[in-house]
């Protein structure tokens, strides 16, 4: 399966939210066997990146299901990036997972997508523990998506607080507080600055994870570059310490950067996915 063939997949669109907050989310679905794969991308990225396409190609070669999508304000989805918050993007992640995934899933989250994957796992655990879930029929339970495991690539849980707000100068914090937005220079993509809003920072505080144990109920594989300028390796260690001790593996790639998109990095990511299922 060539990358050009993968790119020719037409996206499906779903509506998430209601009223003024309704937005159209672009989803690409590859039918196949379980365990399926679902890709959760990073902040200000899209589902056509190197890692996402490589995973989709790997799934296609093995007849595995694969789901990719763009958050609102990203890629082919509707909505404005400036309106984005962690809760808003989590709502979209849950909607895509529930609508397009069936059976066990390997959730692969990159950077912010790592935070999304952890929040998604927590949300799934809450729903499975609900009285409604226990009363569901055997057929409906078999059709429901579940977690086979998480593969987290340079995961950035709590990044709005720990890696942004706490690292900003008082001048930048003041601008965000007073103007509601700060344009941050970017070293990726076209290099254009992108908006960081007060809403992103403040709403993100509703979803912080690193202050207590994180129960995900499945195996976790973490891949982290020691040379990552955006998510320091210490952040990955802090996350690993918050996860259950059983079946959590942290792989430190000594010469790896934030993107982890080199051929050798892709090979490690795919190996982690294959190890889970």
Model-derived segments and their meaning:
Residues 1-32, 262:
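N-terminal cap/lid segment of alpha/beta-hydrolase-fold proteins
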Residues 8-11, 127-128, 144-253, 257-277:
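The alpha/beta-hydrolase serine catalytic core
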Residues 34-42:
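Short beta-strand element of the alpha/beta-hydrolase
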Residues 43-56, 234:
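The serine-hydrolase catalytic nucleophile loop
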Residues 74-101:
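Catalytic nucleophile-loop/oxyanion-hole region of alpha/beta-hydrolase
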Residues 96-133, 138-171:
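Primarily recognizes the serine-hydrolase "nucleophile elbow" in alpha/beta-hydrolase
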């Amino acid at each position: 399966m060539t990358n050009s063939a993968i790119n020719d997949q037409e996206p499906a669109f779903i509506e998430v939210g209601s009223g003024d907050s309704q937005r159209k989310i672009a989803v690409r679905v590859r039918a196949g066997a379980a365990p399926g794969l679902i890709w959760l991308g990073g902040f200000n990225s899209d589902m056509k990146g190197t890692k996402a396409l490589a995973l989709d190609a790997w799934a296609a070669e093995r007849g595995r299901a694969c789901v990719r999508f763009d958050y609102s304000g990203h890629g082919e989805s509707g909505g404005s990036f400036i309106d984005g918050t962690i809760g808003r993007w989590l709502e979209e992640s849950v909607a895509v997972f529930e609508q397009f995934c069936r059976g066990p899933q390997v959730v692969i989250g990159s950077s912010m997508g790592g935070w999304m994957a952890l929040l998604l796992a927590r949300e799934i655990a809450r729903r499975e523990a609900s009285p409604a879930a226990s009363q569901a029929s055997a057929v409906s339970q078999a059709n429901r998506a579940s977690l086979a495991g998480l593969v987290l690539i340079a995961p950035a849980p709590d990044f709005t607080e720990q890696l942004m707000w706490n690292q900003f100068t008082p001048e930048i914090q003041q601008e965000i507080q007073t103007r509601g937005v700060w344009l941050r220079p970017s070293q990726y993509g076209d290099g254009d600055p992108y908006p960081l809003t007060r809403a992103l920072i403040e709403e993100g505080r509703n979803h912080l994870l690193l202050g207590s144990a994180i129960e995900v109920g499945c195996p976790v594989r973490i891949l982290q570059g020691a040379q990552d300028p955006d998510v320091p390796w210490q952040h990955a260690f802090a996350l690993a310490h918050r996860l259950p001790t059983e079946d959590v593996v942290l792989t430190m790639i000594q010469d790896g950067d934030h993107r982890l998109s080199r051929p050798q990095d892709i090979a490690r990511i795919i190996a982690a996915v294959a190890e889970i299922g």
